[in-house]
Swiss-Prot record:
It comes from Maricaulis maris (strain MCS10) (Caulobacter maris). This is dTTP/UTP pyrophosphatase. The lineage of its organism: Bacteria, Pseudomonadati, Pseudomonadota, Alphaproteobacteria, Maricaulales. The keyword Cytoplasm applies. Pfam families: Maf. It comes from the Bacteria. CDD domains: Maf. Its cofactor is a divalent metal cation.
Length: 208
């Protein structure tokens, strides 16, 4: 018998992230987490580390930091914005956010979201998803208004594409949900590969 067998209780899905955006994305796809249990790790980059490998490493470390459960799948993720080899911060101050927006204005950048999952049998899978985004050239009043909104706080690269900053995007190649914080297509494939009943959950409409 398999985990997807209707005779067996459905395994739980634990989101090892405090991000409300990731919770909402999963819920909207019919994959509402049964619990939110963030893990805490050192998120500083290693000297010389590139944006993509950083996102993947942090997602893996978050998933492995969870104690696990014999009836649950653990899902973790991390998003990193990069301009070339440069890693942009998750902005906490207006000055940081302003520097990020000045740098992104009129330029292409890349958003990397690492995803990692562990099954009840401790099987593990992870990958990183890259999306290319181009911003319009931002005027000073636009930057000032965005800073005043506070939407940038705690966001990778100092912006939230699903909010006001969506008006800044000229072009996007890749996963929109990956930029928001969790690439749904790749996440569903990752969980399915580990034995989580993704399709059955979608049929439930996300009900637990």
């Amino acid at each position: 018998m398999t985990l997807a067998d209707p005779a067996l209780p459905r395994p739980r899905l634990i989101l090892a992230s405090a991000s409300p955006r990731r919770f909402d994305l999963l819920s909207g796809a019919g994959l509402s987490p049964d619990a939110v249990e963030p893990t805490h790790i050192d998120e500083h980059e290693i000297p010389g580390e590139l944006p993509g490998p950083l996102a993947l490493r942090l997602a893996q470390e978050k998933a492995m930091a969870h104690p696990g459960s014999d009836d649950a799948f653990i899902l973790a993720a991390d998003t990193v914005v990069g301009v070339g080899r440069r890693i942009l911060p998750k902005t906490e101050t207006e000055a940081e956010a302003r520097r990020c927006l000045d740098l992104l204005s009129g330029r292409n950048h890349r958003v990397f979201t690492g995803i990692a999952a562990r099954g009840p049998d401790n099987r593990f899978a992870a990958r990183v998803v890259e999306t290319r985004v181009k911003f319009k050239r931002l005027s000073q009043p636009e930057i000032d208004a965005y800073i005043a909104s506070g939407e940038w706080r705690g966001k990778a690269g100092g912006y939230a594409i699903q909010g006001r900053a969506g008006c800044f995007v000229i072009n996007l190649i890749g996963s929109f949900t990956g930029v928001v914080g969790l690439p749904l297509y790749e996440t569903a494939n990752l969980l399915t590969g580990l034995g989580y009943p993704v399709t059955a959950r979608m049929g439930e409409g996300g009900s637990a």
